[in-house]
Amino acid sequence: MARMVQCIKLGKEAEGLDFPPYPGELGKRLWENVSKEAWAAWLKQQTMLVNENRLNLADLRARQYLARQMEKHFFGEGADVAQGYVPPSN
């Protein structure tokens, strides 16, 4: 049976992550409060931030920026939006 969490991002109970996706205390908070669905949405957002801002993940500052954005995305006011991004209309 899948592990269920009360997802902080989706505001509902959903299937939890299989393991902490990030080291340390932040990884533990993510594992306890974020669903697989919300994590998949973050990975798409993160990819846009990396591509649009031309981040070099070998650079410590780029990795720190992404960690701050991840924390804001799940536990704060929301991550930055990739400049020029227009969400698809349904």
UniProtKB/Swiss-Prot annotation:
One of its GO terms (cellular component) is cytosol. The keyword Signal does not apply. GO terms for biological process: cellular response to oxidative stress. One of its GO terms (molecular function) is iron ion binding. Keywords: Iron. It holds the Pfam family Iron_traffic. InterPro entries: Fe_traffick_prot_YggX, Fe_traffick_prot_YggX_sf. NCBIfam families: PRK05408.1. Could be a mediator in iron transactions between iron acquisition and iron-requiring processes, such as synthesis and/or repair of Fe-S clusters in biosynthetic enzymes. Belongs to the Fe(2+)-trafficking protein family. PANTHER family: FE(2+)-TRAFFICKING PROTEIN-RELATED (PTHR36965:SF1). This is Probable Fe(2+)-trafficking protein. It comes from Variovorax paradoxus (strain S110).
